[in-house]
């Protein structure tokens, strides 16, 4: 069996790569000449990396597409190619190695600790989330938050997104904690602020709860379910919250529901109408965008810049 001798964080320009990696995602892309290639996101315990599968010169676009469709995200595959820096990002390029993507490697012979990227201290996140819930004075609202989270399988394991931010095991819980702490901080920072802190906290704690139902565990990772795009996590989260409305003042419950439905801000179907809803929207964006920017700059050298794959903006490191 091929041993795990190369890790994502060790891949650098011009090196030969031949090692097992988790394939997090496989997307079919079109080349300028009308041909096809596969954009892979690969990972292991050290993080995520990019990989482009070009195939061989005699392969048709249909054959490349067939390989892409057969790849099972979350499984371990042999990645055989060479590294190259393109637009500031180090990528693995695969030609003949496309044959290695026909089937995943058997997981039984691998140590999961070498392949699972899980930077979150979940015990610490649980403790701090509990502290945020404890700040809610209204017992009905506190019970609502606890009941929804406790009845949501995968809340502490699921990622917060497929790629752009907190895209790792425990990412949803970590992002929820960050957004809640930021929202609470905003409520106490702006002068002459009058916000319903209980409603603000509940809305922040539950704003992304629907994402837990949008992913399922596969192999060494999580993959997005059709519900992720067909229904959307906001609607799924709202449905979960509505099942636990008993015991909460109707007006305050409606406000919590508004925060959840409006947390995408001016680009969402429901626009924020209250200071609490705007605070959660800004907190959500701050957590997501800062995580993306931090990840995009993590491997930059001083005075180096590139287009960040996650934040989709040019990033620079001083």
Where are these regions (language model features)?
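OB-fold nucleic-acid-binding modules
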Residues: 1-18
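Divalent metal-coordination and catalytic microenvironments
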Residues: 21, 74, 179, 260, ...
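OB-fold single-stranded nucleic acid-binding module
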Residues: 26-39, 49-53, 57-111
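Acidic/polar residues in short coil/turn loops that connect beta-strands
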Residues: 42-46
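Acidic/His-rich, divalent-metal-binding segments that scaffold phosphate/diphosphate chemistry
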Residues: 105-228, 266
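Divalent metal-dependent catalytic cores for phosphoryl transfer on phosphate-bearing substrates
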Residues: 168, 174-175, 185-299
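A short alpha/beta connector and helix-capping loop motif
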Residues: 298-307
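N-terminal intrinsically disordered, cationic/polar leader segments
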Residues: 306-311, 316-318
């Amino acid at each position: 069996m091929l041993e795990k001798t190369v890790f994502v964080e060790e891949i650098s320009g011009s090196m030969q790569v031949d090692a097992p990696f988790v394939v997090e995602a496989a997307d079919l892309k079109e080349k300028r000449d009308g041909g096809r290639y596969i954009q892979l996101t690969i990972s292991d315990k050290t993080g995520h990396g990019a990989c482009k599968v070009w195939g061989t010169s005699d392969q048709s676009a249909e054959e490349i597409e067939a390989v892409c469709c057969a790849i099972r995200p979350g499984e371990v595959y042999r990645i055989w190619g060479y590294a190259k820096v393109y637009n500031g990002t180090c990528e693995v390029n695969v030609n003949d190695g496309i044959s290695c993507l026909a089937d995943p490697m058997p997981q039984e012979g691998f140590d999961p600790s070498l392949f699972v990227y899980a930077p979150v201290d979940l015990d610490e996140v649980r403790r701090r989330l509990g502290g945020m819930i404890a700040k809610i004075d209204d017992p009905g609202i506190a019970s609502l938050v606890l009941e929804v989270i406790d009845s949501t399988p995968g809340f502490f394991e699921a990622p917060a997104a497929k790629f752009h931010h907190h895209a790792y095991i425990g990412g949803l819980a970590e992002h929820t904690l960050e957004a809640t702490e930021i929202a609470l901080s905003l409520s106490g920072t702006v002068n002459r602020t009058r916000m319903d802190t209980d409603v603000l906290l509940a809305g922040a704690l539950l704003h992304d709860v629907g994402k837990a139902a949008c992913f399922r565990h596969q192999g060494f990772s999580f993959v997005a379910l059709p519900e992720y795009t067909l229904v959307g996590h906001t609607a799924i989260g709202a449905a979960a919250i509505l099942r636990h409305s008993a015991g909460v003042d109707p007006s305050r419950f409606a406000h919590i529901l508004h925060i959840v439905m409006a947390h995408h801000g001016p680009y969402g179907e429901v626009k924020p109408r209250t200071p609490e809803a705007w605070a959660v929207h800004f907190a959500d964006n701050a957590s997501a965008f800062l995580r993306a920017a931090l990840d995009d700059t993590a491997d930059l050298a001083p005075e180096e810049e590139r287009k960040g794959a996650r934040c989709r903006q040019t990033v620079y490191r001083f």
